[in-house]
């Protein structure tokens, strides 16, 4: 028996809605990364995009446990000498909570050519409303 390798057009894509209210950021991001990659499907193939679309609502209500709000944060470098920038999660969640989820999910995806394709299938919204009702997304409890 040969190993099954999925083709990109063979795997049906579904839409899921996840409510981030009261969910820890890391656990939420890990579950989202699994769905975006398609690892929850039996047809999973590592080099093919077999994942589903994910809509995250109520991004402003995601939580961080312990002292991570002040101690941890988002680091980036401007490519200039001494250009290491640090934004604490408290400030990031106040101004751009959707970006905090996107950064966490991006870090949990493989660092290859498929990562940008996976990230395009992630839609994050600050409040409870989203414009994707036409896709008939399923509510996914995490």
Curated annotation (Swiss-Prot):
Belongs to the universal ribosomal protein uL13 family. Pfam families: Ribosomal_L13. GO terms for biological process: negative regulation of translation; translation. Keywords: Ribonucleoprotein, Ribosomal protein. This is Large ribosomal subunit protein uL13. GO terms for molecular function: mRNA binding; structural constituent of ribosome. It comes from Caldicellulosiruptor saccharolyticus (strain ATCC 43494 / DSM 8903 / Tp8T 6331). One of its GO terms (cellular component) is cytosolic large ribosomal subunit. The keyword Ribonucleoprotein applies.
């Amino acid at each position: 028996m040969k190993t099954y390798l999925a083709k990109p057009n063979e795997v049906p894509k579904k839409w899921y809605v996840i409510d981030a209210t009261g969910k820890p950021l890391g656990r939420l991001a890990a579950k989202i990364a699994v769905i975006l990659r398609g690892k929850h499907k039996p047809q999973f193939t590592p080099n093919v995009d077999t994942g589903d679309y994910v809509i995250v609502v109520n991004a402003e209500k995601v939580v961080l446990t312990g002292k991570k709000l002040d101690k941890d944060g988002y680091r980036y470098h401007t490519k200039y000498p001494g250009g290491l920038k640090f934004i604490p999660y408290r400030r990031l969640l106040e101004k751009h909570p959707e970006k905090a989820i996107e950064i966490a999910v991006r870090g949990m995806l493989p660092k290859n050519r498929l990562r940008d394709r996976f990230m395009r299938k992630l839609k994050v919204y600050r409040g409870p409303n989203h414009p994707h009702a036409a896709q008939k997304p399923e509510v996914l409890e995490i």
